[in-house]
Design a protein with these regions (language model features):
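Helix-breaking motifs and short loop linkers at transmembrane-helix boundaries and internal kinks
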Residues: 35, 67, 88-90
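Residue-level signature of mid-helix packing/kink "hotspots" within the transmembrane helices
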Residues: 49-53, 57, 138
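Conserved MFS/SLC helix-loop-helix module at the cytosolic interface between two early adjacent transmembrane helices
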Residues: 56-79, 83-86
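Small-residue (Gly/Pro/Ala) motifs that create kinks and tight helix-helix packing interfaces
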Residues: 59, 140-148
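Paired small-residue
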Residues: 93-101
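Cytoplasmic helix-loop-helix junction between adjacent transmembrane helices
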Residues: 100-129
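Conserved small/polar residues in nucleotide/adenosyl-binding loops
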Residues: 150-156
Length: 160
C-alpha cells in the first residue's frame, strides 16, 4: 500500500509540474490574441507565485485541520478549475482571476505532499518527487506544441 501511495504522489507531482511551464510556452500565441503587452505574462506569473506563497504559508494549519488527502483533493480540483479558466478566459483579466486558484492550488498540494513524503518515506523519495515535477514541467510544452501549431478549431488565445 505504501508503494501505491508513493506512485500516486509521483503522478500528482507530474501533474503539478505540467501547468508550471505552459504559460511561457503558450504566451507567444496568447499575447497578440488578448491584445496585451508582452510583459503581461509577468503579472500572471506573479499572481500565481503570490497564491503559491499564501497557500504554502497556510499549509500547516490546513493539513492539521483537514488532512493531506482532503487538502490534496481540493488543491488538485482548484488547479484543474484554474486551467479550465485559462482555457475559457475571454480576456486578460479573466486569466488573472484564474491565476489565483492556480497559485493557491499549486502551493497547497506542493506543501502537503512534500510534508507527507518527508514524514512517511525515506529521504531519497523526496529527490524522486521533485524529479517527477521536472518531468511534468518538461512534458507541458511538449504536449502543448502540437496543439498550438496545428490549426485545430481552438482559438489561439485558448491554447493553455
Amino acid at each position: 500500500m505504501a508503494t501505491f501511495f508513493l506512485c500516486m504522489i509521483y503522478a500528482a507531482f507530474i501533474s503539478l509540474g505540467l501547468p508550471d511551464s505552459l504559460l511561457g510556452a503558450a504566451w507567444p500565441a496568447m499575447q497578440p490574441a488578448l491584445g496585451v503587452p508582452l510583459d503581461s505574462a509577468g503579472v500572471l506569473s506573479m499572481i500565481v507565485a503570490g497564491g503559491t506563497v499564501v497557500a504554502s504559508l497556510s499549509a500547516d494549519r490546513m493539513l492539521h485541520r483537514f488532512g493531506t488527502g482532503r487538502v490534496t483533493l481540493v488543491s488538485v480540483t482548484m488547479t484543474a478549475c484554474a486551467l479550465l479558466g485559462y482555457a475559457l478566459a475571454p480576456g486578460f483579466w479573466w486569466l488573472a482571476l484564474a491565476a489565483v486558484p492556480m497559485g493557491l492550488g499549486a502551493g497547497a498540494v506542493d506543501a502537503g505532499l512534500n510534508n507527507f513524503v518527508a514524514l512517511h518515506y525515506e529521504a531519497r523519495h523526496m529527490s524522486w518527487l521533485h524529479c517527477f515535477w521536472g518531468v511534468g514541467a518538461t512534458l507541458g510544452p511538449v504536449i502543448l506544441s502540437p496543439v498550438s501549431y496545428t490549426h485545430l478549431t481552438l482559438p489561439t488565445k485558448r491554447i493553455v
